[in-house]
A protein has these predicted regions:
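Conserved beta-strand in the GNAT
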Residues: 96, 102-111, 127, 132
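Conserved N-terminal entry element of GNAT/NAT acetyltransferase domains
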Residues: 3-5, 17, 21-50
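A short helix-loop-beta-strand connector motif used in the catalytic cores of GNAT acetyltransferases and
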Residues: 81-96, 127
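Conserved GNAT-fold acetyl-CoA-binding loop/helix
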Residues: 60-82
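Conserved acetyl-CoA-binding loop-helix of GNAT-fold acetyltransferases
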Residues: 130-133, 139-152, 175-179
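Conserved GNAT acetyl-CoA-binding A-motif
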Residues: 154-165
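Conserved beta-strand-loop-alpha-helix junction that forms the acyl-donor binding cleft
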Residues: 163-173, 190-193
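Conserved active-site alpha-helix within GNAT-family acetyltransferase domains
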Residues: 144, 156, 168-186
Length: 193
């Protein structure tokens, strides 16, 4: 049986460069004792979409490799187009981290609201969809700077909190988020048929 991303996803293997470009998703890689530099975080612009596409390919490749029936192979060009569209949406936050003018990470999040119902109260959160840091800048404060900036945006938007999910395989990311005060509150299970 073909893997789902082979059958249903637009993919370009040439864009799946991953660690060859010195990139790693949150929770992976090491800083190798490098000196922490000043990290500047700013909202991404249309001029940043190619860099976002390259960084996104790393996150996507990790997930596609780990769960090929659930995640498509990376396509940096398509990801750049995706981010170009997202940047125009008022409920979307895309942040870029830079050190010395070099792109070293990004965060993509979306404001989500739930009305109160019989079972659950009203909720307004910033859902963190993706975060990625260059592997050569891991443990250098990039991820922390991105998450801090996201939290500041959530506060300025009057949201109740931030929410995210991470793959059960990604223990490094889980430890990173725990170090920032994130706690597990839900476990999703799946059975493939």
């Amino acid at each position: 049986m073909p893997r789902r991303h082979d059958r249903n996803c637009a993919a370009n293997a040439d864009t799946a460069r991953g660690h060859q470009n010195g990139l790693a998703p949150a929770g992976e890689g090491a800083n190798n004792g490098r000196v922490t530099r000043s990290v500047a975080v700013r909202p991404a612009t249309a001029a940043d979409v190619v860099a976002l596409g390259r960084l996104n390919a790393v996150v996507q490749e990790l997930h596609a490799r780990t769960h090929p029936t659930e995640f498509c192979a990376p396509d940096a060009t398509a990801a750049a187009s995706f981010f170009r569209e997202k940047l125009d949406q008022p409920n979307v936050l895309v942040l870029l981290a830079e050190e010395g003018g070099r792109t070293v990470g990004y965060l993509y999040a979306e404001e989500q609201h739930r009305e109160a119902n019989l079972f659950r109260p009203r909720s307004s959160v910033l859902e963190i969809h993706q975060i990625c840091t260059r592997s050569d800048r891991r443990r250098g404060g990039v991820g922390r700077a991105l998450m801090t900036a996201a939290e500041q945006h959530a506060v300025s938007w009057g949201l109740d909190g931030l929410r995210l999910s991470t793959g059960s395989f990604n223990t490094d990311a889980q430890q990173f988020f725990a170090s920032l005060g994130y706690v597990p509150y839900s476990i999703r299970l799946m059975r493939r048929l």
